[in-house]
Amino acid sequence: MLTWLTRDSLTFPPLEKALHDPNGLLAAGGDLSPERLVQAYRHGCFPWYQDGQPILWWSPDPRTVLLPDQLHVSRSLAKLMRQGRYQVSFDTDFPAVIAACAAPRDYADGTWITDTMRNAYCELHRRGIAHSVEVRQDGKLVGGLYGLAMGQLFFGESMFSRADNASKVGFVTLVNHLRDAGFALIDCQMPTNHLHSLGAHAISRAEFADYLAHHLDQPNSATWVA
């Protein structure tokens, strides 16, 4: 039975209460306040819904993740990065990155990044919790991604690319940055061929919960220079 959240409580149901069909649907309702979003990620769930639907909270099993020391960079991608065709930065234009991620895609109907969601994550960015990666070519934004950094975990949300492999270059740069800063895991949420090609793999919900328990409150040395 699906749990409906109320606006006056930030409590989520136990992860094992998530539905099997659809896989991982944990709760509905509530809001996208910064406090609730932080609590959601700490609990192991994230919001994902279409405009016009109630807010839906998910904790899929299995969960797609990437361990920084298991990053796979193909020869062709490594060569592209050495060429210096793209310039990568952090936190220089979070609003532009999330707007680009929210833009319609040829292969999808609509977008799950609603205006309300964009505003919510921009507020998390202002609070130093959400971060962006910008990939530029000749000064033009051609790729990027955003997510949340908590303790030694990074929760990836969405990425976009307007030039060949631009999002991959941004993702690889981010993973190397996180590895050097002591991060233990990047949460990729759902499987894609794009992420699997970079070394992402599936773990059980229980194993993901163990990472939360052991790494959420541990320090990291990441710097995000705007």
UniProtKB/Swiss-Prot annotation:
It is found in: Cytoplasm. GO terms for biological process: protein catabolic process. InterPro entries: Acyl_CoA_acyltransferase, Leu/Phe-tRNA_Trfase, Leu/Phe-tRNA_Trfase_C, Leu/Phe-tRNA_Trfase_N. Keywords: Acyltransferase, Cytoplasm, Transferase. Its main location: cytoplasm. SUPFAM superfamilies: Acyl-CoA N-acyltransferases (Nat). The keyword Transferase applies. GO terms for molecular function: leucyl-tRNA--protein transferase activity. Gene3D superfamilies: Leucyl/phenylalanyl-tRNA-protein transferase, C-terminal domain, Leucyl/phenylalanyl-tRNA-protein transferase, N-terminal domain. Its EC number is 2.3.2.6. The keyword Transcription regulation does not apply. Belongs to the L/F-transferase family. Functions in the N-end rule pathway of protein degradation where it conjugates Leu, Phe and, less efficiently, Met from aminoacyl-tRNAs to the N-termini of proteins containing an N-terminal arginine or lysine. This is Leucyl/phenylalanyl-tRNA--protein transferase. It comes from Pseudomonas putida (strain GB-1).
